[in-house]
Amino acid sequence: MQRDTQVFDLIAKEKERQLNGLELIASENFVSEAVLEAAGSVLTNKYAEGYPGKRYYGGCEVVDQVEQLAIDRLKELFNAEYANVQPHSGSQANTAVFHTVMKPGDKFLGFDLSHGGHLTHGSPVNFSGKLYNPVFYGVDKETGLIDYDAVAEIAEKEKPKMIIAGASAYSREIDYKRFREIADSVGAILVADMAHPAGLIAKGLISDPLPHCHIVTSTTHKTLRGPRGGIILMGKDFENPFGEKLKNGNLKKMSTMLNSGIFPGNQGGPLEHIIAAKAIAFGEALTDEFLHYTVQVKKNAEKLAQAFVEKDYKVISGGTDNHMMLIDLRNKNVSGKEAEEALSKADITVNKNMVPFDDKSPFVTSGIRIGTPAVTTRGLQENDMNKIVDLIDRVITNIENDTELEAVKKEVNSMMSGRPLFVA
């Protein structure tokens, strides 16, 4: 069959874009050649509905071993008793948890999207806000930090069945112990969504949700530096508190219910080529090299945030404890949309993002979200962060000056020239 040059030419263009630019989107990263190889392997040919040893198709002897290896490595990485590696995405993992814990119309408490939460934490345009009854907590207007006393007050008033601790645009440590105390006080299931900082959590660099939360979900890309996908974890399995029973009359374990929440609850056959790529990424994450990488991600983020503050940019909460930061551009009289578009012309990729108490729409926004996982994978270190902020500042202050944007682009291209996508 003739090679599809139209598609492969586009893939080549995308590779050039990634090689030439500064990738500062906090949710993006670059995977190893081994992860890429597994994701493009013959495992994509195999259907495997069910779980290892309990499939609805024949010929699963090898993919059973692949999936079990991914499960075992993931358990070791997070010291977890239970792991499911089948979710196609973090959103699918969250969907399975909702299906397992909640019934349509049940109330839950999530992080307000405009304050740093995620679509699946109760946005009205998402299944979580359409099928269920969300109430929200947020951050303090002055500090930009989660107000745990306010969370406790809302929980006491609303009595949610489930509380979600986690964010897509929050740069500080999350106090999972305090969240568990709040959840226990109202009899709620506590779910952590650690999609963003999972790699840092795995190496002990920031607080670990598994000892405190009933259920933990994550993506496998971002700071875990694996293929695009999702996972579900529990530090300890436990009998479900909803009275769901097996045929023998015993209470079902939450692991059984979560597995059913994924298959057949909201997915069919798992993507075994992606699960193989996950297994490789988990293996990489178990190494000392990955520890060195995550330490550098955190150092780079701290330095980047500091450099923004020194340039009179407002960093929400004043800094970062993880891999990302949220920049409020209102004192620069530039919208997030304008900044994203101008930076893109200079081969600097960020995403526009609402800031807490934003007065602009989600399509415009007052801020940008920036992260260091991808540039750290390419080998950049603290001494490169001031240069990055200088380049961003030149774009922000010359947003309609195409000549200056082109000059910045040339400097970006020179800065990244000769650097492979995967160094660290």
From Swiss-Prot:
Cross-referenced InterPro entries: PyrdxlP-dep_Trfase, PyrdxlP-dep_Trfase_major, PyrdxlP-dep_Trfase_small, Ser_HO-MeTrfase, Ser_HO-MeTrfase-like, Ser_HO-MeTrfase_PLP_BS, SHMT-like_dom
One molecular function GO term is: pyridoxal phosphate binding
Task: Name the chemical reaction catalysed here.
Answer: (6R)-5,10-methylene-5,6,7,8-tetrahydrofolate + glycine + H2O = (6S)-5,6,7,8-tetrahydrofolate + L-serine
What cofactor does this one take? pyridoxal 5'-phosphate
In-chain residues carrying the UniProt-annotated modification N6-(pyridoxal phosphate)lysine? K222
- Cite the PROSITE patterns for this sequence: SHMT
Q: Which GO terms describe its biological process?
A: glycine biosynthetic process from serine; tetrahydrofolate interconversion
**Keyword ATP-binding attached:** no
Which residues carry the site feature described as Plays an important role in substrate specificity?
H221
Q: What class of enzyme is it?
A: transferase
EC numbers on record = 2.1.2.1
Q: Which GO terms describe its cellular component?
A: cytosol
Annotated positions binding (6S)-5,6,7,8-tetrahydrofolate: L113, G117, H118, L119, S361, P362, F363
Q: Which Pfam families match?
A: SHMT (PF00464)
What pathway, per the record? One-carbon metabolism; tetrahydrofolate interconversion; Amino-acid biosynthesis; glycine biosynthesis; glycine from L-serine: step 1/1
How does the annotation summarize its subunit structure? Homodimer.
Enumerate the HAMAP family for this protein. Answer: SHMT
Summary of the function given for this chain in its UniProt record: Catalyzes the reversible interconversion of serine and glycine with tetrahydrofolate (THF) serving as the one-carbon carrier. This reaction serves as the major source of one-carbon groups required for the biosynthesis of purines, thymidylate, methionine, and other important biomolecules. Also exhibits THF-independent aldolase activity toward beta-hydroxyamino acids, producing glycine and aldehydes, via a retro-aldol mechanism.
Family membership? Belongs to the SHMT family.
- What is the protein named? Serine hydroxymethyltransferase
